[in-house]
Structures are given as structure tokens and as C-alpha cells.
Amino acid sequence: MRIFRPWRLRCPALHLPSFPTFSIKCSLPPLPTDEDMCKSVTTGEWKKVFYEKMEEVKPADSWDFIIDPNLKHNVLAPGWKQYLELHASGRFHCSWCWHTWQSPHVVILFHMYLDKAQRAGSVRMRVFKQLCYECGTARLDESSMLEENIESLVDNLITSLREQCYGERGGHYRIHVASRQDNRRHRGEFCEACQEGIVHWKPSEKLLEEEATTYTFSRAPSPTKPQAETGSGCNFCSIPWCLFWATVLMLIIYLQFSFRTSV
């Protein structure tokens, strides 16, 4: 009796068509360092506006303006003062998926010091960054601001500087559009300032009423996933995922064409 051994069966050879090979050479730009991130287009505008306004207010004193991404909230050297702008308006641009978004909750930290004997002072600034909530990348992106917004923010900085460093009173802080209450929820898990413990946003009464109405007529959120994180997952329509699905589709078409030609 002959024993049937299925593993000894010979399958007909498949002759796959040969396609011409080609290679695409592309060079990706190097990732910018923290020093390059500080030298953005708006950095020159900040210095230009600050120097012009300080020349009008205190022409006898010399001041320098430095961008410092390592500045810490409430961590001050002796003699230094602090001013915190909580509601600046800025536009962010993701360096990975090219998604852009507007935020009226940009936090800017200033540290100020004046040497009255030398009649010289220094201002250090840090603009807190945000994460892109579309692609979910862990890369922090910096914001860009309009010139009129920078002017109002510098006016507020100089008002605080005159109060804390020169002991002058009677200044007025400019209330710009971004400092008004906003009805959109601020996603603290994507905000660098929120992650460092700076509380700068709370929902308006209108937003609280809308959330209460939504909670009444809809199912309660899962305890394992807070409502604030809704929509913060992976975006399958981003460019990396589109390239992945296009590769899978091309592979399927290639296999179908190969089997048809072999038959």
C-alpha cells in the first residue's frame, strides 16, 4: 500500500513577469535643532518691535532681547522678575504632516532684569509649543504670530517691565482678541505649557452648558478614556498612512497581475 505524502506534491512553477527596476533618490532636510527653532521668522520681529518701543520709553537705558527655550516658570535668578502672557494668539505648523491650526491659548514666558547702576537690562522670552493632534507625533511645533499681535504683546511686556523693574505705575495692559473667552476646548495633553503645570485655560460658561447638554442626551464616556482625549488618536488620512495604503494596493495589483499571466 502506497502512503500518500502531501508535502511531496510538486506545484507548477509560476513565472512572474520581470519589471524594470528603478531607484528614487531623495534627500530629506535635516531636522532642525533647538537653536534653529529659536531663529524663526518672528524672532526678528520680536526684537525689532521691542527695541523700537524701548527706545521711545527708556532711551537712556540699553536692553537686550534673548530667546531662551529653557526658561522655567517661577524659576528665577536673584534680581530677576517674571511676566507671563497666558492668552496669545498664534498659528502652528506641523513639521511632519503639514497640518496647521490656530490657537488663542499660546503661553509666553518673560524673565526681566535691570542693572540700575549700569543702566542696562535683559529680557528673556520663551514661547511654549504645542503638539499636532492630527498625526500624533511627539515633536513639538512652535508658533508664528502676526506683527500686530506681537506689538500688543510687547506693549504688555513693557508695561510689566516698567512696573516691576522701574517701580512705575499707571500702565495699561492691552486686551487683544486672543485674551477673550474662547468657546473651543483647549487640549491640554497637546500643550507644552499645560504639561509643565501652567494653568492658563478654563472653559467658558457657554461651553460648560453645551457639554452638560451633550452629557445629558448622550452616553457617558468610558472611564478608561477621558472625554478630553476624544479625537486625539491616530489619523489614518495623514500622509504616512496614505503612503502605506498605496503600497498595499500596489502590492495587491502586482500579485493579481502575476497570477493571471502565469495561468
Swiss-Prot record:
Coiled coil: none
Residues exposed to the Extracellular side: 260-263
UniProt-annotated location(s): Cell membrane
Residues exposed to the Cytoplasmic side: 1-238
Chief place of localization: membrane
The keyword Protein biosynthesis is annotated on this UniProt entry: no
InterPro entries in the record: R-trans_p, ZAR1/RTP1-5-like_Znf-3CxxC
SMART domains from the UniProt entry: zf-3CxxC
GO cellular component terms given for this protein: cell surface; endoplasmic reticulum membrane; plasma membrane
Membrane topology type: Single-pass type III membrane protein
Stored Pfam families: Zn_ribbon_3CxxC
Protein origin, superkingdom: Eukaryota
Any one Gene Ontology BP term: protein insertion into membrane
Tissue expr: Predominantly expressed in olfactory and vomeronasal organs, in mature olfactory sensory neurons.
TM region(s), chain numbering: 239-259
GO MF: olfactory receptor binding; zinc ion binding
Keyword annotations: Cell membrane, Membrane, Metal-binding, Transmembrane, Transmembrane helix, Zinc, Zinc-finger
Residues in 3CxxC-type zinc fingers: 88-197
Complex formation: Interacts with olfactory receptors.
UniProt record similarity statement: Belongs to the TMEM7 family.
Task performed by this protein: Specifically promotes functional cell surface expression of olfactory receptors, but not of other GPCRs.
The name this protein goes by in its record: Receptor-transporting protein 1
Organism: Mus musculus
Organism phylogeny: Eukaryota, Metazoa, Chordata, Craniata, Vertebrata
Gene: Rtp1
